[in-house]
Every structure is written in C-alpha cells, then in structure tokens.
Amino acid sequence: MSFLIDTNVISEPRRPQPDANVLSWFRRTDQAGIFISVLTLGELTRGAAKAARRDAAAGRRFQKWVDEIQTGFAERVLGIDLKIASLWGELSVARTVPVVDSLLAATALVHGMTLVTRNVRDVADTGVAILNPWES
C-alpha cells in the first residue's frame, strides 16, 4: 500500500509534543510506501522562510530539517503533471476546496494512493482514500 502524506503529517513528529497515534502510524508503516508531494516541500520551505524572519537560527534549523526530508524522500517526491492538473480542475468544480489539499487529493487519486492528512473535511468529497493518523 502506498501513502501520500500531507504537510501536517510530515511535520507532526517535529512538534514538541507529537501525537502518539501519528508516531505509531509512522513506526508501523513501511517507509518505502510513504511519498510526499512537491507541494509539501514548498509548504515546508515556506515555513522555514517564515521562521527565519522571526529568528534566523530557528529558520536555519527548520531549513536543515526540510533539506533532510527532501534528501530522505528523494525517490518518493511526486510532482504535478497534466493528468493531476486536469483531475484537480474537475474536482474543483463541485465545491471550493483549498488548492493544495485538492491537488494532493488529485495526486493521490492519479497514483492510486491513500492520502494521509488531518484535513479530512477538505478532501472528503473528492473520492480519494483518506487516512487520518490522529484517529487511527
């Protein structure tokens, strides 16, 4: 089974008090089956840049972590192609869904993956298989 993880999932273990269910999900899941999107890397990079504006050292630490994520997932980073963009366009007609969340749903659908996210409500109507590790 393959999973596409949202930014909130990849970020959870880094929190001062990460959710035990999320940590357990990561331990139980074959890492080779976990993928991230270029969108997630973009959101993480944005987070590092925002952190650097407040505290340069914290921003560098955050960016170092983002670089480690990018290296660790090197072969498991999914881009946005024409098929994903077209499906996203179709999914966006039914109702307004946050762009990144709906692009992640389209990516997971095209690749036959389960989307792992806490934002279940945002993608519930897309038809994507969803797993919320906070509730597993």
Indicate residue ranges for each PLM-predicted region:
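Short, conserved active-site loop motifs that form the nucleotide-linked donor/cofactor pocket
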Residues: 34, 75, 128
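Residues that scaffold the ATP/ADP-binding catalytic core of kinase and kinase-like folds
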Residues: 12-13, 25, 47, 87-91, ...
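A generic structural signal for short hydrophobic patches within well-formed alpha-helices
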Residues: 10, 41-44, 85, 123
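Active-site neighborhoods of divalent-metal-dependent phosphate/nucleic-acid chemistry enzymes
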Residues: 46-49, 60, 71-118
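Short, well-structured N-terminal submotif of metal-dependent ribonuclease cores
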Residues: 1-36, 50-66, 136
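Short secondary-structure boundary/capping segments
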Residues: 1, 25-28, 68-69, 77, ...
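Residues at the C-termini of beta-strands that transition into short coil/loop
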Residues: 38-39, 81, 119, 134
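Acidic, PIN/NYN-like endoribonuclease modules and their adjacent C-terminal/linker elements
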Residues: 1, 105, 109-136
